[in-house]
């Protein structure tokens, strides 16, 4: 197309291989991340068809969803989890795919280690059999989750049929107030849009508040794009992006680096480019957020009350609210700050990076977890764990009564030993609060790392803006 183009349109146009008659365009894929849960059948399909992995140099695997976060890590008690992990090891060895296994210092959550290792780069198309692949869009990449059959397709061809999504601009002006984080921004946006407000769109986040975010904060924001229904979320690369990538293990070096930066600097939305939809948000209006229901759009500020379903005139929404309140065992009008928690989970591909752990450690330093609370911290990768231990953050957490774990997806989802018991209520830094997400009958409230840390100490949700740091 001619004329001003959006960042997404620039990436899309350079990756379309061909457009078959009456078929979706064929998109070339620059990076394919693989994990143990959505890959076994895909590799089986390759084997049955006698095919190879087309580009093993563009494919990287890790174990994260099912892995234990306690020692000994190599003892996997769940039979299904053990079979999936063993299958990934067998398949990676057979097909020549690099694997960051449990014994590797590079192991971690797939959406944490990709950027951490310098594998995620601006302008790329990136896929993984996981919905939160949108995380990598923080680097100015078109990154999206795919299903198992599509995993097989990419393994075999390094391409994927894809219909072109619509575009949405979310411009966040101003400055985030003290105590308000990228997680609060993400939840605030989803609360405004709803969980289907961005369906069929790729979101580009822009504005002064976005430019002020660190790369780790940008990853948190893009990670949760899918929770608003978006296909992907992305942020144009800038000097903050380049500084993060520079000198990472797999990042370009020397002349290739200089060439890369020059190309990446052009990856921005042209002035006058048109979006299918635009949303404008004033960062100054945001407050720390807490979800109260069973999807991320059921969210209010920490100083608000649990909403009353009777206040809405929409029958479907009222019924949804009523069901959520029943499941969450909450009453309308209850102040959020009076909701007590049993568990606190700091981790996940949303909030398990070093900045997240630093923020939480700052809150708990000098305090101790409430007697009624069981709290745990799960670093997003072994490298983050090592960095945190180098900084003494593990001691801060342990002294405060937190469990300090090995890396993995952990309590984000009920696919490993880290789950809630029925009826337990958890302040979680993860991205989904669906019924049973953290274990059958478990009740999940999504918050930022600092808010989760404060809840662990007080035993209930607490406005982090009023916290007395020691």
UniProtKB/Swiss-Prot annotation:
Q: Which GO terms describe its molecular function?
A: 3-isopropylmalate dehydratase activity; 4 iron, 4 sulfur cluster binding; metal ion binding
Pfam families in the record, alphabetically? Answer: Aconitase
Keywords recorded for this protein, A-Z: 4Fe-4S, Amino-acid biosynthesis, Branched-chain amino acid biosynthesis, Iron, Iron-sulfur, Leucine biosynthesis, Lyase, Metal-binding
What pathway does this protein act in?
Answer: Amino-acid biosynthesis; L-leucine biosynthesis; L-leucine from 3-methyl-2-oxobutanoate: step 2/4
Q: How is the cofactor bound?
A: Binds 1 [4Fe-4S] cluster per subunit.
EC number(s) stated in the UniProt entry for this protein: 4.2.1.33
**Classification via InterPro entries:** 3-IsopropMal_deHydase_lsu, Acnase/IPM_dHydase_lsu_aba_1/3, Acoase/IPM_deHydtase_lsu_aba, Aconitase_4Fe-4S_BS, Aconitase_4Fe-4S_dom, IPM_dehydratase_rel_enz, IPMI_cat
Reaction(s) catalysed by this chain's protein: (2R,3S)-3-isopropylmalate = (2S)-2-isopropylmalate
The residues the record assigns to binding [4Fe-4S] cluster are 349, 409, 412
Q: Record's family?
A: Belongs to the aconitase/IPM isomerase family. LeuC type 1 subfamily.
Q: Which NCBIfam families match?
A: leuC, PRK05478.1, PRK12466.1
The entry's protein name is 3-isopropylmalate dehydratase large subunit
